[in-house]
Amino acid sequence: MSSKISDIWYTFCPVVCVSHIAQDKGWLKEEFAKDRIKLSHISTLPVKDWQSHFTHKHRQLFRDGGNIPPIWTRSEGVDTKVIGMVWAEGGQAILVRKNSLIKSVKELAGKRIALPRRLPNLIDFRRATAKRGIIMSLKAHGLTPDDVQFVDLPIDIPDIATETQPPERTGWAISPETGWQIPQQPEVEALQNGEVAAIYSFHGREVILEQLGVARIIYNLDKHPDWKYRVNIGYPYICTVNADFAREHPGLVTRWMKVLVRAGMWAKENYAEVVRIMAKATDVPEEVVQKSYSTDFHKHLVPEISERGIEALETEKRFLKEHGFINNDFDVRNWVDRSFLDTAFKEVEVETRQ
């Protein structure tokens, strides 16, 4: 017999995931308030518990966002379940200096490309994201990693909470002309001083860098026709939950997914509002969201679980294992549990007909 739940915690990456809509509109809190269940962000917990965004050690936690930390967590033996996925089309690019003569990725043969390394991190998801994005961009142009030189850029400040210290948002500066925050300062500095010829950027940062004249996009990986090339931290974004919690409280997990399904359906008809919510969630201007993501990205925020998604997670896991970001293998298909989402869709359909 499951115990009664009075609190649920949540944590969402600052990315384009449907949970931000449900949270912004108050729909999640509204749903669980019916049973006097309080929803709280993990930042309301002691600092040492903030690591749950990456470790998933907090039992009553829903997480939504990039797939690399959850893959790492599962590889470390933490029993979680993937209960939903969304596909954000956009936001992966290779950039060079604004005045560089380089016009295509093919011209990067023999050149140096920046690869950030956050030394204290539990899982260096930014490095993993950049490395896969660069390698797949090279592959799309007939090149391999052996054709370029990766330049490590060590960053010794963690962006994951420690036992006593909150995460720090490092690598950002303020543009005096626009007031916009300039991301990826270590990479930008290496680019501008000639230490490297190119950098990888994603999640709208590439648009900011080009808009501010800091760098120039020479390739958008998200435009590649084969979706397998685009697999990365945000392709797909995934929603995860502690497996024991899900087994003991399947009704609560289903209700959570029902709210996300309805939020995704609402998003299809509300582009401008979705842009506003995502700009706020990702801490960038609205025009950056509009330029970084496809014009119909708001129509692809309904959670799903598909064979494509399972294959994408298997591809990502295999990449992380081959490149030393995770140590242990696991069964992706067994990690994914579609039962909650299937039930959520059925109940939403019935309720819509009433």
Named regions from a protein language model:
Residues A33, H224-Y229, H300-E307:
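Short, solvent-exposed loop/beta-turn-alpha elements that line the ligand-binding surface or hinge
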Residues R247-F325:
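Secondary-structure end/capping motifs
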Residues M1-S6, E351-Q354:
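Short, low-complexity disordered leader/linker segments with a strong preference
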Residues K81-A88, Q149-L153, V214-I233, D331:
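Short beta-strand->loop
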Residues I68, D159, T164-P167, A173-A279:
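Pocket-lining segment of extracytoplasmic ligand-binding domains
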Residues R318-Q354:
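Conserved C-terminal helix/tail region of periplasmic/extracytoplasmic solute-binding proteins
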Residues K34-I42, L143-F150, T282-S294, N327-N334:
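Short, surface-exposed acidic
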Residues S3-E163:
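Short, glycine-/small- and polar/acidic-enriched structural segments
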